[in-house]
From Swiss-Prot:
Its EC number is 4.1.2.13. Pfam families: F_bP_aldolase (PF01116). This is Fructose-bisphosphate aldolase. Zn(2+) 1 binds at residues 110, 226, 265.
Amino acid sequence: MAPPAVLSKSGVIYGKDVKDLFDYAQEKGFAIPAINVTSSSTVVAALEAARDNKAPIILQTSQGGAAYFAGKGVDNKDQAASIAGSIAAAHYIRAIAPTYGIPVVLHTDHCAKKLLPWFDGMLKADEEFFAKTGTPLFSSHMLDLSEETDDENIATCAKYFERMAKMGQWLEMEIGITGGEEDGVNNEHVEKDALYTSPETVFAVYESLHKISPNFSIAAAFGNVHGVYKPGNVQLRPEILGDHQVYAKKQIGTDAKHPLYLVFHGGSGSTQEEFNTAIKNGVVKVNLDTDCQYAYLTGIRDYVTNKIEYLKAPVGNPEGADKPNKKYFDPRVWVREGEKTMSKRIAEALDIFHTKGQL
């Protein structure tokens, strides 16, 4: 497969370009990290890592992250702050991403049933943006109705996908249960057997959504858990993703190696072998949030620890009682330290997922 034109594009991509990127990822055996962003600082940390490693990147806002982007002082009644924050983040990313010279998928993360007003607000913004520009504001959105019955989950996704498909948007949906807790969806106490989706259930999603558009991916559960846990506490079985592909191929009657676009949730703390197996079985996107949050902290933590004597007062430090400390407490200095350590962690992920050097 020849490298698609999307690899040479700069800025936010959508529609056929997103599909071409995911097709190429499956063909070449790599996955794209999806980084949760909550501020302009975390956005540029992710973009910098992708640019420096010649890789595409997915930037996504969660419902809570979007509310934070809007400002914690904004009332989130009826998801107003989350809607405003997501839209603000989208416009910011659209404005700054071309500067970094890489293709960027602009995505939104888990949206549970109780958060659908947030989704509705974003989709309204997409349709308004599309009417003016011919492109949706966001490349893609995710619906996570895994707490509902499979029938309701699939039917609701199909209803929204009908609207999204008119704009060429990509839909990610979750079927089965990812353990742990993630912005509005809490599955910390489910039985372990419930953390594995069956091939029949995954194919039911395909049957419903493929009639509308091929632009969708499935986050099927294979033991995933959000957050980071001690080794042995999480039993991932990424090999069952191959079972989903085989079953779908048989049902469709296709020779395509990977008829399904799959997503790996709860990627923080997983092993290289687990990632390799998942990617081999058609995973094109890996969510990475908790690891990035901690990485961002470490840069700031270490800076404050090492410069503590320069941060106790505006004036006065070990070099003299009259020495100013502005160059040490300026937010641009210590926030930058968090950006650097977050970028480093994303660079590691780009290497692990074989995304590095794909542009």
